[in-house]
Design a protein with these regions (language model features):
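Hydrophobic structural segments
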Residues: 1-108
Length: 108
């Protein structure tokens, strides 16, 4: 079964809730472990354009937000459900989500 690395960027205030949403949907599972993720903090920048309904910031003004990058692994079976759960729970109108398929590395 294929595994994926998923990365989502979320405001720091929403990071704990997002990690729980990810786990509840089946992400962050590695062998006999759950809730497996890695996080780093940084500054997200964006400019809402006309027609946007930003949760944070104003249309036509560049906004900077302290965000947390949450990365975790996800099985192919759980991937679509995890992505749907992230989109539903994410505070942003257009959440930044990256997905990579991982190489199958045999265990010795």
């Amino acid at each position: 079964m294929s595994m994926y690395k998923v990365v989502v960027f979320v405001p720091v205030a929403n990071a704990d809730e997002m990690r729980q949403v990810i786990d509840d949907a089946g992400g962050g599972r590695m062998g006999n472990y759950s809730h497996a993720s890695f996080s780093t903090r940084g500054i997200g920048r964006f400019k809402p354009l006309g027609g946007a309904r930003p949760t944070i910031g104003e249309v036509d003004k560049i906004e900077e937000v302290e965000e947390e990058r949450i990365e975790f692994v996800c099985s192919e079976d759980a991937l679509q459900g995890v992505l749907a759960a992230i989109r539903k729970a994410h505070p942003y109108e257009e959440p930044a989500i990256d997905v990579w398929q991982l190489a199958d590395i045999p265990r010795n």
